[in-house]
Amino acid sequence: MLIRLLFCIWAFWFKVIAAEFQPKVTRTSDSTVFYVAAFDDSTTLLRVQENGMFISFDNGGTWQEPNGAPSGVMMVDIDEHHRHDRAVAQTKDGQFYLTEDQGKHWRSLASPIDSKEYLYCDLDTHPLRRDYFLVRCTKCPEMEMGSSQLIDLHKRDSFMPSCQEFSYVSNNGGKDFKKIESPKHEPSPDTEYLGVTCEFASKSVESTLPSSRDLIYCFDGKMDKWFDNDFTFQTSGVLFYTDDFGKSSKVVDQFKDLTVSNFEVLNSHILVYTLEDRFNRWSASNLWVSSDGFKFSKAFLPTILRDMDTYGTTEDGLGRIILPLYVESEDDNRASQILISDSSGLQFRVLELTPEDNMEFSILEASKTLKGTMWADLMSLVKGPRYSGHPSFDFHQVSKISFDYGSTWSNLKVVASPNHRKDLFTCDINDVDHCSLHKLFGDSLPTETAGILMTLGTVGDGSENSWENLMTFISRDGGKTWEVAFEYPCQFAFGDLGNVIVAMPFSPDEDSDPQSEFYYSLDQGKTWKEYQLEVPIMPTELISTTPDSSGLNFIISSFSLTRDNETPPGSFFYTIDFSDAFNGEVCGPKEFESWYLAGGECVNGAKYSYSRRKQNSQCLVRKLFEDLVLTEEICDECTDKDYECSFGFSRDSNGVCKPDFKPLSFSPECMKSGKDSAKVKPMTKLPGNKCRKELKIEPLEVPCTQGHTILLTENNFNSKIQMYQYFDTKQDETLIIDTARNGVYISHDSGQIVKRFDPGENIVEIVFNTYHNSYAYLFGESGKLYVTANRCQSFAIAELPHSRQLGLPLEFHAKDPNTFIYYGGKNCKDMFSPSCHPVAYITTDGGKSFTKLLDNAIHCEFAGSLFKHPVDENLIYCQVKEPQTRKRTLMSSTDLFRNDKKVVLEKIIGYMNTGEFIVAAVPYGENELRAYVTVDGAELAEAKFPQDLTATKQEAFTVLGSETGSVFFHLTTFDEPGYEYGALLKSNSNGTSFVRLQSAVNRNLFGMVDFEKVQALEGIILINVVDNFEKVGTKTEEKKLKSMITFNDGSDWSYIRAPPKDSDSNSYGCNTKQLEKCSLHLHGYTEREDVRDTSFSGSAFGMLIGIGNVGEYLLPEDQCSTFFSRDGGETWREIKKGAYQWEFGDHGGVIVLVPKNSLTDRIFYSIDMGETWSDYILQGAKVYIQDIVTVPGDSALRFLLIASSSSVTGGSTKTFTVDFSNVFERQCSLNPDRPDNEDFKFFSLGQSDSKCLFGHQERYLMKDNYDCFVGNAPLSEFREITKNCSCTRADFECDYNYVKARDGTCTLVEGLSPAGPSDICKKQPELIEYFQPTGYRKIPLSTCVGGLTLDGVLSPLPCPGKEKEFKELHGVKSAPYFFTFLVFFLVLLVIAWFVYDRGVRRNGGFARFGEIRLDGDDLIENNNTDKMVNSIVKSGFYAASAIFSSYQLLKRSMGRAVWKLSEKFGRRSGPTYSSLLHDQFLDEADDLLTGHDEDANDLGSFLAEQGNFEIEDEDNELPPLRAPFTDEPHMESTETAEPVEPVEPVEPVESAEPTETAEPSSSPPQENYNDEHHDNKDDEQDLGAQ
């Protein structure tokens, strides 16, 4: 009893002494301190401040300048590999200094470069060789040392060429450095060189890589720019190594044909990233892993690596790779996810940490001392959307902890502290799922203590994270539970292995006390004591002087908060010493307890514990520089946690390892078996696991045939997929999937990983920006608009104007992505309220704010941003619907309808834009329409249809597009449901007058037309025509459709040539040479289930696929086969019996087919551009594949199948991502100087041997080898016109009011006469001249030169009454010509006189030249001039004599011949010159155009010479000259034509072919004799081939 009493007295007295204890604190004042560093296991400190570097050997008690200290030190680092004695300092000029004796002495390292040229250099030391140094220097041409510009120095895989990096190595302690050169560096003027960056292959002393200690890995990168745009770069990255310190270097052979983009060295692995596509800097990347530094294997990842920043890659305690992925977008936002590998490093899985898992930032940290413990900090989109009136992002921050190496995760549980008030938290801390600790993002937890941890954070559900609510928390159980230490944020540090803790508020008034203080605890944070400082300070740093937290000394660096206006803020430096705590008492063995990690659970087959001081013990450990010792107890029983899934298996939602068929065939068991299947154990024991009684795991028989090349990923949805769409960009393969019941899902990798977008409300509509491909808009039912500008990497939340959502689409500005129009309903209690009306609102800041644009507007367009040459860039068109009368008006404005508000058309039905034109439908009469067109927004002109269609009641029309400078237009001529068809028309260049191309083109009830224009190939169009339209028009027969094709933009049409044999090599049941009865017919656009599907690909030049049949007419789809063409539709072949859906990939290098409307368990594919086909079996039950899609550019190697379960109709959907990226071993090689030299070849398309289309020969670059893939190689940039061809009939089309006759010629519409000059000149009074039409006009796309001229390129003629102006316009200006002639005449006269004087007159005159001379000695030749003149005179005399003699001879001969002919044919009379011209040369002129280009050439030249050759019989006088195309119908002129000389009337010609007995006629042939008397002997096949 006495002993107990004495013990109590002693304990009480000891507590009194302890309570009175205060640490020893010293303060010094000096210049601003930037940084303090401590050597490990030492009392030596280094301090960098404004006036240099200082050293302390007594834990900061005293400071001095080190011996040989460099001046101007701006940074000092303790060497991470030699922390006890080595440090590196860097001066402002970039010079490195080294100490190897804890700062006592310093020496400079040799400088490998001129520091003025470089922005930044860093130095690496070798963990095992103290004399090895590696220096990396970054050079940025446009940035200077110390620049404030921010750059991402670590992200070398981005291929951003603004900065270059160079590496230098030393093996003699830094006495000299050698630059490491790449073995494949080939600089050129168009190369953006990224430089060489290197790393030692030994990462640390813990490295398990068996590679040489001298081995250095390096990366050399460059970008070659080929064309003047942002997308035609070829990136080149090389991985090489040196093992002799830069004397030689060798490329890693495994990557010599690949494009390396980055590499990283870890303790157990080396990672190498390669670009899948060297022509796309945002390309998907592949990860290669090596565990020995030499042999690399391709890793399998659950997602696509694309433009990733992998900074922070590390390994956990099991050697597994932790791969945080950060995707940076255009607006500097990031998205991230964390991948973790298995122990091999080859199979990764996504670390599922949050329900949303759509993180903006994520950090994963593994503890070095707490085995199995990992922390994760995550930021994701806020779960419940909030909008505070400003355009900020709301983030949801979550903190997680795991005690079993990431197998399971939990929130950080908060427990109540008896020292703090109960209402401290706004949520129930017992509900840990919704009320937990969320630590400050990125705050690293110290782990040098035995489970005693501190952090800053907030308590809640993570949706509200603010500095205002930040508190300081402490844990004594390794993070399982946390309690509040301080209700405000503090800096903190540990000493004596956690038995001494110092904390200091960031601000002195945090505790409502303006004076500064720090707090300390001697019982592991249970109680705290305050130490008041003399002056108020702002602490900048609080550290323990021993990095392992074993010491008892601390340092505080701070700024003074008291100063006058003239004195700059002072700097205070405090040292704190706890050596005298508990009177120096050292803890005995009884004062310790065993603390078990993970609550005593087995971790990797063992229980781990530390021995630590009991919390209330009145002593300190005082074991300076001694690290914690971990105790291990082996566990007997093994559990599933001791195992990981084998390669090729992954855990399902129940934690069971199931086969993952994507990587399974690459498992070691499958690779060794060589068979179609192998037995594989689903689980394997974790490396280093020590549990004794292993689980009995039965092997499973798994297939090994699937997946060797094609990888398949399956996702299941418990709801019908009702919408899916890709973003049309090269950056990634992002798509949005909208389900009927489960909301919206987002995938960035073509559906491999699908994440639900959950803003806390239903999404009712999704709209993609049609002009800016990274933008999309998701409408919430509450009135919020979720805007993404980076393909769903992040969202901004906008508040829509307070109105009812009407479901009208957004209208976008073509040039400004932040400007768009939203339509909302005002005064709408419900949609049928009389006062409910639409209002158009406009935003110009991406949805941050909206302003009212116009009442009652239901459709607006930013017209000024659409046209090539707009009348005003700010022009807006709006369709306004008056609420009462329901009248619709087209209005325009150039100032957002503030002051400028014009009525363009009083009454319209609607309008649309085609990209180049705006077309408005205007009501006309009863149930009739008229079309008005504008090309610049200045004026809408009525579209003039051919005269034979003006009587047609225009009840409906469809605008089909305007890609080639003309509007294609379908005018419905019969619209009875089920019997619809109409005329296909094509406009002139301004869209105001149309010519008819076909009369009965098929359409359906919804206005869709069987019209398909092939992208990337000029002028190729497919249509379906109603062959029996006369009977369909009377509803006596169903439609009989025939397919037709044109290769010259609609001028000539032909039936599609059928293949000679089917896919089974059998002949068809008709003669394929008779196209009228036996041609290929394809189902068209009107039958497409998805209007986005096309028969072609814009990137697969010449490739077409369609469902159809060979015969006289198109058959139902279930009786059809699937056909394929590689030459733009000229020839076809059957590839599959039955109807299939299709999709192109890799520019046509990969084609995938899936059965249509039938159950299937396989797909069919071709990897040789349609030459051969193979099948691939889908695992599982058969499904209905509803659609197959890929990125809009058809350049990817991944396809997405949308399928529905066969057992559930419409209720359950699954997706399959089919990945062909492993099919090809390499990417095709493309040399810009000789693009057709290696894997590519030029191909030409065309219907004849000349290969001419649109007047030129054009070549397309296409893949020629099938063992490589194209990627985003800029093939379209190499498309070239090799030459322009001579014009032929195929380069012309019929002019306005002309139609093509059966013989192929263009004739006037029946009942019309050619327009006279009054028709043209009267309509446009300002005209002075006009041109005579021929009925033809040149196709706008044609570039032909010379050859046939059918388009009326004749001499201009004057308008009536404008003869004077015409002569002035074309008359010759006499004065310039007169003076020119006068000067020439005078010069000639002088020369002639000189020759006459010196050569004729002086030698006796002209008479002397007629004499017979014996010699020429008597000619006067005193000099060379005389000789030359005499020679000229003699030559002229001889030439004149020869001409005169020839004339005399010819005259005699002609006279004799005429006399003989008159004798022989005296009784025959010949035609006059007039009759010869008109009858014999021009009879049957149109015959010359039918199928004979040579004859057409003759006719063209004749037209060019003759002008007019048609004569009216009735009035015996020449008609007015015909004008070219006009917007008015060509009617008979009522004006009196100018009189012309009459001719004799004649009888019309009866025969189309002159004979010997035909009577000659002196009159020209009649106007339309072709239609009546000419027989065309060429069939339509010939016409189509012209």
UniProtKB/Swiss-Prot annotation:
Residue stretches spanning the membrane: 1375-1395
Record region (Disordered): 1511-1586
Record-given protein name: Vacuolar protein sorting/targeting protein 10
Species of origin: Zygosaccharomyces rouxii (strain ATCC 2623 / CBS 732 / NBRC 1130 / NCYC 568 / NRRL Y-229)
BNR repeats: 54-64, 401-410, 473-483, 519-529, 841-852, 1123-1133, 1164-1174
InterPro entries: Sortilin_C (IPR031777), Sortilin_N (IPR031778), VPS10 (IPR006581), VPS10-sortilin (IPR050310), WD40/YVTN_repeat-like_dom_sf (IPR015943)
Gene3D superfamilies named in the record: 2.120.10.10, 3.30.60.270, YVTN repeat-like/Quinoprotein amine dehydrogenase
Membrane side Cytoplasmic: residue ranges: 1396-1586
GO BP terms: Golgi to endosome transport; Golgi to vacuole transport; protein targeting to vacuole
Residues the record marks as carrying a glycan: 990, 1284
Membrane topology label: Single-pass type I membrane protein
